[in-house]
Amino acid sequence: MRKLSLVVLLSLLNAASAEQSYLVDWDAVGREAIDHLVELVKIPSVNPPGNETAVAEYVRAVLVAEGIDSKLYALDPTRANLVARHEGNGRKPPILIMGHTDVVGVQPEKWDADPFSGIREDGYIYGRGTLDDKDNVAAGMMVMILLKRLVVELDRDVIFLAESGEEGTPDVGINFMVEKHWDVIDAEFSIAEGGQGVIRDGRVHTFGIETTEKMPRRVTLVARGTPGHGSMPRLDNAVMILANAVAKASAWQTEMRLNETTETYFRRLAAISPPDEAVLYENVTNPEMTLAIQQQFLETFPYHYSILRTSVVPTVIDAGFRRNVIPSEASAILDIRMLP
């Protein structure tokens, strides 16, 4: 979280006049940003139903205390988006910083701690939204705060958008802002979630930049068979048929395909990695080594395995209503992320 805020802010400060210099206590900034992240995590905004307005109101209150104007835009009054702007001299088009205020659902019984507690322990913060995406909301908010405190003069406006509905309901969030309020978020480019940062020994080792995205697709597999009593096995048991289909889909290794971005990524990663890792990155396309490398990625570096191919992952299985009854139908959802 702290590293992200520093990277974003430094990129903006570097865009200012070379004659300007800013004295910043980054440790203090980091602590302040983390304090805000904890408070954001404490606000439940599970989508559905959302309740993102509560998060937006917190952000607005923090910005108001810093003398920063902001405005809420809502298709649904409980699911507001927040926009704030730091004005530059207008020589260049604006830059947009984004973070989404909703989070995915939780199964509290699976958690060791309350998912909305923001507990700090052993250098970690525990809670839903710490990684997706209230960390970016806190970072974006801190960018706006520091630009204001330091009176940073830029050649472009900096816009901060805390959006609702990213987790599956964009009609109240980014779609609404684009279709109805494009003028307040129109920018030359945007900094948002995506890419990946790696910290080693307390320092940033790599910071990946996303140039395009996979396309998400959902496929539902449905198996039908003859219902009956669990004491009498059947060859057309819908659960058995579905299980075999899911197993085949899980074992299917789609074709590996690199593009200019991933080729550059592995080449540069090899140059800064330990020898035992570098050899993997250097030989991803080596016909004699690629299968073994891909298998190692699958076992130990799933992120690297995924960016090489379209992924097919079963996520939800639905079957049966009694433990002693063979159901007539069973279904499974496959989460497919297609290479561009």
Regions found by a protein language model. Give the residues of each.
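Sec-dependent signal peptide recognition
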Residues: 2-7
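Acidic-enriched catalytic cores of C-N bond-cleaving enzymes acting on peptides and small amides
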Residues: 182-186, 195-204, 210-216, 230-316, ...
